[in-house]
């Protein structure tokens, strides 16, 4: 944001120079990122002096050139060849001396050099208006007052404004400082802290006078929530023309291009007071009627830039009796603005809902000075005052008259905030005691009204325009930035607390698993926790009432917190596959959020998503597609790495998956995974099979903290392997057999593996064949055949009893 030093001094008459002022503003939290000199004339007329033409003779070799002798003062007389028809002896003229830099019409610099023109030496240039950037005239040189002494700097004689422009890196929360008036308020508070008491200079509105009421507008506001306050007034008999130099220079200093006296006046008040205004050509307002309302989705509207836009049903519009004229608070329409033919205007000043403006501006990809301020929240109390100030200025610049009463629709006043500050809490947070009277003075200097002061704290009223100061902590921050961070002493003691190292460190576990997944060919992703509420419509598993809704969303697509990691993973997968990434393996650590009647729930998760092949194809072999069992192997490998085993399996009953499993331990779900339902993947434009896993990371971490891990030495006695080929029902899973086996033989059974599955011919209907491998080992001795047979018989009997299994 650009702030003019000269403009700033219109509001606060400080004798501090620009450098000191910039340093104080930075200390106050308005960081000065750059300071740039500005001149209303390119180059500031540096090197231009007043010369006295002593003689003027015809050039011997050119009919249109004259050879002059010019006195530049201090006994310096130079010869200059000039082609202007009006140059004559005795004139006082502006002279660009050798080495002076001038600027052409496009702003490109060029330098005056000593040279010869048609054989005559020329040691400078006598300048016309356009050559100095003072106007457009080029039919002759400028002739100055004859009483000006030769050698006088042209910048002292001609109308040149020199200024300093601050580039302020304004943080989004400081909507109150988005104007010269707002910056001046902070500067006053900072100066008062340094015992320099200055009052703000408020633009007067005493000249506001209604000449007649011949041009009235009927204003209707359909939705008071979208437009809490709407003001307007008509001005007639205006003359559209170029703005005076003082106004053009103010706007040019902050990189605004002057347009005409009416538009420039609205821009001037916007950057002066922070209140956006809009001038409508009154003759183009059908029915002398202003309707502030929304229009149906799909309505076409052409903005000032000539772009036809399709409106959304939530876009607030300024309409007349027949048509839309302006996107409220964002951008004007192509047919409603001020032109050279305009003779009367309706001047609008309003307070629009910040959330509504932000959504509309983002939907249409627009970012204007008005929307920038409206979406951050302006001062609702300034709306009428700024209108009066701008109306007076327009009347002065255009010769117009006010021809209606001020319309002010403000049914529900926006209230100031009430905050109580505890002194002890303030001092504890600041780290140093600040006297109560100092705190009171700082608050008063920030226009925060002190209601009452007690032994324990201070009650106050925060102005509505300070929408960033709503809590006790915010008030403490305000006190601290004005008091000065540099004034807080450094304690002689260093207080520190050492975190307990007992238990599992979450970040170490996360890094361990991330490294493992990376080694397996996965890439880590990071998705937005904000998502679209429409995703809940893709599944009955997720409920719309469980959405945690954002109060001020950037867009509808980012208006709720995610209930599941799945949809962000599918967005990333779709993004990659659309860019020809055939084999995708991604993982993400993140949180999910759910809203319940009495509480909100936030849980940690780890998600995996896989599509395509297990690995890239090589020249020597073709790699198979990543299937359910490959994916299960990755998941169990992660759990094994964490020392979690002996978990049970159960099928998932969720429309998120076409098939899937949950792995559980101690009646807690560790992970749910499976093949994502095609109805969901197609919504994201993904046609291939997608595997997704959702680790309940918070549950896993809690189990790791409660599990007692026992370290044992490797046994010196051999392992023994035995196999079973079992004929079982199709409904029986390997996990069921595995868990039953470990329950049956708890001491000597070490491992159970499934190494073959057969279904098809030669088997009874509804049956399948599993080939299982059992690993047995005694830590203290070598197992005998008798012991082994006894264990295997026990397992066989248990399988027969529990599952109706038979040996093949």
Language model region names:
Residues 1-211, 346, 369, 379-380, ...:
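Phosphate-backbone binding interfaces of nucleic-acid-interacting proteins
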Residues 419-582, 775-779, 787-808:
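Extended, well-folded interaction surfaces typified by the phenylalanyl-tRNA synthetase beta subunit core
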Residues 2, 444-448, 468, 472, ...:
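A carboxyl-terminal module marker
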Residues 49-80, 260, 266-335:
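Conserved mixed alpha/beta core segments that line enzyme active sites in large multi-domain catalysts
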Residues 118-133, 137-143, 154-164, 291, ...:
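Mobile "lid/hinge" segments at catalytic clefts and subdomain interfaces of large enzymes
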